[in-house]
Amino acid sequence: MMALRKTKPTSPGRRAVIKSVNSFIYKGKPFAALTEKKKKNAGRNNSGRITVRHIGGGHKQHYRIVDFCRNKDDIPAKVERIEYDPNRSAYIALLCYADGERRYIIAAKDIEVGSYLVSGSSSPIKMGNAMPIRNIPVGSVIHCIELRPGKGAQLARSAGSSAQLMAKEGDYSQIRLRSGEIRKIHISCRATIGEVSNSEHNLQSIGKAGAIRWRGVRPTVRGVAMNPIDHPHGGGEGKTAAGRHPVSPWGTPSKGSRTRKNKRTSNMIVRSRYSKKG
């Protein structure tokens, strides 16, 4: 069972900590054949310049190679264990297929160690099974959804996320995402039944600044505390306001301004996430 634990305030750093405690999470090391080294570059590019701010330090991590395609069809796989993955908010499950191959997948909510999963057009409608959208009943809750057939899951992959299959018309289905957006997706694209695991992720509290540093995140400096060369809000004598609407260091409005540029796929959006909810 998933549970949240609030620590006793034995120190200021422990006072605000709320963490999830799950007895089913595997305590050992990951499956070595499905891990890769992960080099840290502290947000710098090949010339040493900072290209992504607020990145640096943190605990050493290995990348887990996750199967987002789920293309090993009609071969049952046993859930050997469910693991923590430092690279994502969801848990991952190690599957052992009947032919001996092992793969990591995004763990669906309520799947258990020892249960069997299968992917393919003929697989039953069961939590954690993957299949083309054409084989999924309308109204089903799904996750790990492909945008192009065979490319691998791109939508609804983070902890607790899901989408709902609303309709099927011809070669396309209509899927409602958590944001409220309704999007057309080809029925040959694959999706997994159910909701993503670790739905209590958003209820956790890090508790102290150092725990964020363990994750490789560095502090964020306010623009008004900088010099004018560093930020549009910088400069001034003493403490001063920004003097303009909030913007990023590059002048882009930073409070909800839309920046989407991909007009090529705009015709696939049936209902925008910004439209008023009735």
Curated annotation (Swiss-Prot):
Residues 226-278 are annotated as: Disordered. It comes from the Bacteria. InterPro entries: NA-bd_OB-fold (IPR012340), Rib_uL2_dom2 (IPR014722), Ribosomal_uL2 (IPR002171), Ribosomal_uL2_bac/org-type (IPR005880), Ribosomal_uL2_C (IPR022669), Ribosomal_uL2_CS (IPR022671), Ribosomal_uL2_dom3 (IPR014726), Ribosomal_uL2_RNA-bd_dom (IPR022666). The keyword rRNA-binding applies. GO terms for biological process: cytoplasmic translation. Pfam families: Ribosomal_L2, Ribosomal_L2_C. Belongs to the universal ribosomal protein uL2 family. Keywords: Ribonucleoprotein, Ribosomal protein, RNA-binding, rRNA-binding. The keyword Kinase does not apply. GO terms for molecular function: rRNA binding; structural constituent of ribosome; transferase activity. One of its GO terms (cellular component) is large ribosomal subunit. Part of the 50S ribosomal subunit. Forms a bridge to the 30S subunit in the 70S ribosome. The gene is rplB. Disulfide bonds: none annotated. This is Large ribosomal subunit protein uL2. It comes from Nitrosomonas europaea (strain ATCC 19718 / CIP 103999 / KCTC 2705 / NBRC 14298). One of the primary rRNA binding proteins. Required for association of the 30S and 50S subunits to form the 70S ribosome, for tRNA binding and peptide bond formation. It has been suggested to have peptidyltransferase activity; this is somewhat controversial. Makes several contacts with the 16S rRNA in the 70S ribosome. NCBIfam families: rplB_bact (TIGR01171). PROSITE patterns: RIBOSOMAL_L2.
